[in-house]
């Protein structure tokens, strides 16, 4: 998707910071995991930062939706109801239908309406991108007939992988509430998301998958044609 990814990532207990920068545009901003007194809470929260510059900083004219603001939208019981629905979806994937790993998700609007359910179909569809969060996001966008989900919250049974987290940014979600951590999914399912985060921190030449650019001028010509389109839709 991108010929160059310049990123910085730190993986520590209780905190993950990931930045992906391509062609000077922020793809994924700063992410903080909130923990109380170093104890694992019943639900953890990922605030999604909208916008940013090439250094990963949030510009002054962009609003950050905080954990407190999102969690204050509904009573604790409603948040737990949405999370239990996401967990039930994870059971469909990993135990009942056996379509993939035990990952499930739901998308909830600002008004508290569930507009999409999703669960992992990687094995059933032979599709490495068919994660529970991706399934839910695709269905929500299809329902709303737009590629953005501002005002919505993603509830997911497990802490999102780098792909799903990046997609949450592209979709413009207000926040993510998750159940199990990446450490849990690694311990019980052998899903090593931390390896991918660590790869982003490595220089391009040291990564497990090589990257190089080719025929850039020809590729840029198409971008110029796209830029000249009067009817293009920015997203």
Task: Go through each PLM region and give its residues.
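Immediate flanking context of iron-sulfur cluster ligation sites
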Residues: 146-158
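Conserved redox-active cysteine motifs that mediate thiol-disulfide chemistry
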Residues: 158-166, 170
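Short, flexible loop/turn motifs enriched in small residues
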Residues: 96-102
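A short, polar/charged loop-to-alpha-helix boundary motif
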Residues: 122-135
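Short beta-strand scaffold segments in enzyme catalytic cores
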Residues: 103-109
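Zinc-dependent deaminase
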Residues: 3-96, 167-235
């Amino acid at each position: 998707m991108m010929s160059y990814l310049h990123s910085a990532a730190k993986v520590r207990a209780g905190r993950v910071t990931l930045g992906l920068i391509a062609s000077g545009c922020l793809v994924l901003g700063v992410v903080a995991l909130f923990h109380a007194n170093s104890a694992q809470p019943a639900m953890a929260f990922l605030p999604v930062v909208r916008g940013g510059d090439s250094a990963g900083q949030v510009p002054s004219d962009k609003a950050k939706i905080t954990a407190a603001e999102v969690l204050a939208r509904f009573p604790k019981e409603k948040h737990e109801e949405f999370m239990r629905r996401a967990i039930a979806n994870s059971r469909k994937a990993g135990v009942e239908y056996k379509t993939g790993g035990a990952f499930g998700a739901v998308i909830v609007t600002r008004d508290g309406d569930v507009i999409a359910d999703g669960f992992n179909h990687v094995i059933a569809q032979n599709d490495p991108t068919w994660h529970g969060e991706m399934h839910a996001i695709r269905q929500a966008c299809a329902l709303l007939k737009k590629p953005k989900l501002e005002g919505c919250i993603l509830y997911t049974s497990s802490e999102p992988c780098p792909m799903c987290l990046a997609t949450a940014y592209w979709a413009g979600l207000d926040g993510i509430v998750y159940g199990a951590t990446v450490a849990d999914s690694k311990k019980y399912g052998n899903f090593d998301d931390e390896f991918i985060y660590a790869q982003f921190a490595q220089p391009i030449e040291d990564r497990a998958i090589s990257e190089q650019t080719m025929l850039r001028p020809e590729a840029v010509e198409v971008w110029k044609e796209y830029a000249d389109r009067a009817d293009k839709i920015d997203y």
